[in-house]
Every structure is written in structure tokens, then in C-alpha cells.
Amino acid sequence: MAEERITDIGPPHYEQFLPPVIKENYGKWDHHEILKPGVMVHVAESGGKIFTVRAASPRLLAVTTIRKFCDLADTYCNGYLRFTSRNNVEFLLADESKIDPLIKDLAEYGFPVGGLGAKLSNIVHTQGWVHCHSAASDASGVVKAVMDELFPYFTGEKDLPAKMRIAYACCLNMCGAVHCSDIAILGVHTRAPVIEHDDLPKMCEIPTLVASCPTGAIRPATVDGQQSIEIVEEQCMYCGNCYTVCPAVKINSADTDGISIWVGGKVSNSRIAPQFSKLAIPFIPNNPPRWPETVGAVKNIVETYAENARKHERIAEWIDRIGWPKFFELIGQEFTKYHIDDFKHAGETYTRTAQLRH
């Protein structure tokens, strides 16, 4: 057998980063219990316990903040911590007596504890204006404004019927989980890109630009005697792929870009099958820096859900029970033609779940 050697191919095996109690009881866990907001214990068949303290953190972190988290992990949990897929930081403790001192230190640093169980978890989001060239709205700004209003649902000061997941993506390329979250905030472009014909031949390869369009809306054309392109607006879905390969095809517009709200997505197989999010509010104008219209719309949906849903019902299950007409009535939104999903390839027969229908 060949001798094992160290390479730089792939990440190191995750096992070397697991706390000893998890290694000893891997695959042998009996149950878990939420002790208080943001604190959970997993109990193994052997009686071993691992305590989790979940704290909120921004998606974009400074190195100094990460070092603070590492210092806290060294102090209270032998260096063991992890980040969740929704940007929470979780500290993994073997000693229950260190939970409260850790929470106290986190509070002094300004990081609240919560988000476990029937609570609102951190909002997973995309890059936004800080980095992405095709964003129809900002990510960090909108998420900060929304979480400032919904903060009591994270800490447990206000109750929810079940867990709630909110996601944000700055455009429909969707590098956030907006397709499968209870509430999704999605930046939308509403106009086809503007073509700068004078600059396009100097900056872009036309065959590559034509090939970049997933719907075939871009065609080669001659404009004022020089090679360029044309866009068939009926086929354009405002994805911005063309802008990615050619800066002369500009998708962003301060006047027509905005935000849409989607509801009813879920990943879990519990009770009903996983669901895709569905459109609730087609368009809200961008209004930085605090986006009051967007914040108000999301808060209204959360409060309406909290008031009307049954215990353990996710938003998708609540809407299935009361029906979409009643849902729109409760949130005060008019049903319009823009809510109709006319995408012909979205067949109901496509398998989206491990659940089987007999």
C-alpha cells in the first residue's frame, strides 16, 4: 500500500476539528434539548454531553472580530467553535458551568445569543453593493435594517409558532437561499440591459456575450456600421449574466431596480414535503439606507404569521391550511397577474423531496 503523504489537494478532514466528546459518540446521540434561548445540549447514549451556544454575527466579519471569537473559544471551549450556514457562530462546550460566563462576554462584545428552536435565525445573504457588480439592491444594509426590527424574535423576547428562516439575495442568480426559506427578500432588475454600442466592440467578445444568455435573448447585430448586439426584451429575464462578461451591457438602474418578497419555502421533510418560495410582493423600490418599505413588509408578514399560525406550523404549512387568498387578505396585499408562475418548465411532477407519493 502506498505511503500516505501530505498534499495541498482538498481541505483537511473535518474529524480533526471535532471536540473529543463528539468523536467519542459519533453517530450515537440519543436526544437534544434547548435549555434556554441560544443554548442547546446534545446527549449521547453513553451519557456524554455537548453544549452549544449560538450567537449572531454579521456575514462580513473583520479579522479582529474573528480573533475575538477564537479567543472566547480558547477561554471557554478548548478552541472549538463553528459557523453555521446562516452565519451564526456556535461555541461547543463540554463544561456546562462555562455557558453563562461565555454569554456574558459575548454580550459585552455586542453579540446576542439566540436563534435556536422556534426562533428567527440569522439572515443568510449575498454580497450586495459591497462586492457584487450585478446586485439590484444592497445585502448588508437591508439585512441589518430588517434584523434590527425582528431582533426580539431571535432572542426569544417574542414568540414564533415554529422556526423561521429568512434569506436575502441581491438578484435572481440567487447565491442566497431565497428559493427555500420561509421569507425571502430578492433584489430584482425590471428592465433589459442598456447597450453601450460604442464601447461594446472595444471591451467584449460578441460570441461569448451571445453565449452567456441562458434564454437566447442576445443576438449579434450591426449598429451604425459596427458589430454589436441586440436584446429581445420578451426573452430577457434580467439575470445580468451578460453584464458579467461584458461591462458595456449595463443591467443596473437606480430608477427601476428594487426588491421583491417571497414566502413559503422550506428544506425540511417534516410534516409536508420541501417547498419552493412563492411570490408575495412583486416590487418594492430601493430606499437606502434603511429600506423602510421593505422592512415594514417583512415585519408585517412575520407578525401576521406569529398571530395566526398554529404551533409548529412553518409559513408554508400555514398558507397551505388557510389558502393563498386568505394569506393575501391577512397581509393586506392585492393578488395581481405578477404573482402567476407562468414558467412552463416548473412542472409539478419534478421530484423535490425524499418523500414518496403512492
Q: Which residue stretches match the model-derived regions?
A:
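Short glycine-/aliphatic-rich beta-strand segments at the starts of folded cytosolic domains
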Residues: 15, 19-22, 27-61, 124-130, ...
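Small-residue-enriched alpha-helical segments and adjacent helix-cap loops
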Residues: 23-27, 51-204, 212, 357-358
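A generic structural motif
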Residues: 87-94, 228-232, 236
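A hydrophobic, small-residue-rich beta->alpha segment in the mid-to-C-terminal subdomain
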Residues: 266-309
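C-terminal, charged low-complexity interaction regions
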Residues: 324-358
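Flexible, glycine/charged-enriched surface loops at secondary-structure junctions
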Residues: 78-85, 116-117, 156-163, 220-221, ...
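Iron-sulfur cluster-binding cysteine motifs and their immediate structural context
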Residues: 208-231, 237-260
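A glycine-rich phosphate-binding loop feature that marks nucleotide/adenosyl-phosphate handling sites
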Residues: 123-126, 163-172, 315-328, 348-349
